[in-house]
């Protein structure tokens, strides 16, 4: 049996560019890609916190240290500059891999400042 699990997440990153006339994709600060373990051209899901849009695209590398999140091509209709987004990558894991799997999560503060990283989401309480 295999399960599709969260591999990596950038939580509440701010869209810095929305470029309609660009080949499709999402450019992400290269340092963040490395920290999250997301590969260039890897499929990602983007969830727009501000307007509720959810869409699929792929990651491309932006300049290291740029703090860039650029939503490009047709996806630019779904996210505008200033929108807060959650970017996720998922992967298939075997039963054996599930026992030790931990996602890589990057949490962003305003201005796309990396606040902290984690490999677990706290238990939600009432």
From Swiss-Prot:
The modification Pyruvic acid (Ser) is found at residue 25. It comes from the Bacteria. Is synthesized initially as an inactive proenzyme, which is activated by self-cleavage at a specific serine bond to produce a beta-subunit with a hydroxyl group at its C-terminus and an alpha-subunit with a pyruvoyl group at its N-terminus. One of its GO terms (molecular function) is aspartate 1-decarboxylase activity. It is found in: Cytoplasm. It holds the Pfam family Asp_decarbox. The active site is at 25 (schiff-base intermediate with substrate), 58 (proton donor). The keyword Lyase applies. Its EC number is 4.1.1.11. Binds 1 pyruvoyl group covalently per subunit. GO terms for biological process: alanine biosynthetic process; pantothenate biosynthetic process. It is an enzyme of class 4 (lyase). Its cofactor is pyruvate. Gene3D superfamilies: 2.40.40.20. Its main location: cytoplasm. Keywords: Autocatalytic cleavage, Cytoplasm, Decarboxylase, Lyase, Pantothenate biosynthesis, Pyruvate, Schiff base, Zymogen. It catalyses: L-aspartate + H(+) = beta-alanine + CO2. One of its GO terms (cellular component) is cytosol. Heterooctamer of four alpha and four beta subunits. Belongs to the PanD family. NCBIfam families: panD. Catalyzes the pyruvoyl-dependent decarboxylation of aspartate to produce beta-alanine. This is Aspartate 1-decarboxylase.
């Amino acid at each position: 049996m295999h399960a599709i699990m969260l591999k990596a997440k950038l939580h509440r990153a701010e869209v810095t560019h929305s470029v309609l006339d660009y080949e499709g994709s999402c450019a992400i600060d290269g340092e963040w890609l490395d920290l999250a373990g997301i590969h260039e051209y890897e499929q990602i899901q983007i969830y727009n916190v501000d307007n509720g849009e959810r869409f699929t695209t792929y990651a491309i590398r932006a300049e290291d240290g740029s703090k860039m999140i650029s939503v490009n091509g047709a996806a630019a209709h779904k996210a505008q500059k200033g929108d807060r987004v959650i970017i996720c990558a998922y992967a298939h894991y075997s039963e054996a891999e599930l026992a030790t799997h931990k996602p890589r999560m990057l949490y962003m503060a305003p201005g796309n400042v990396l606040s902290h990283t984690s490999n677990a989401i706290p238990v939600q309480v009432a």
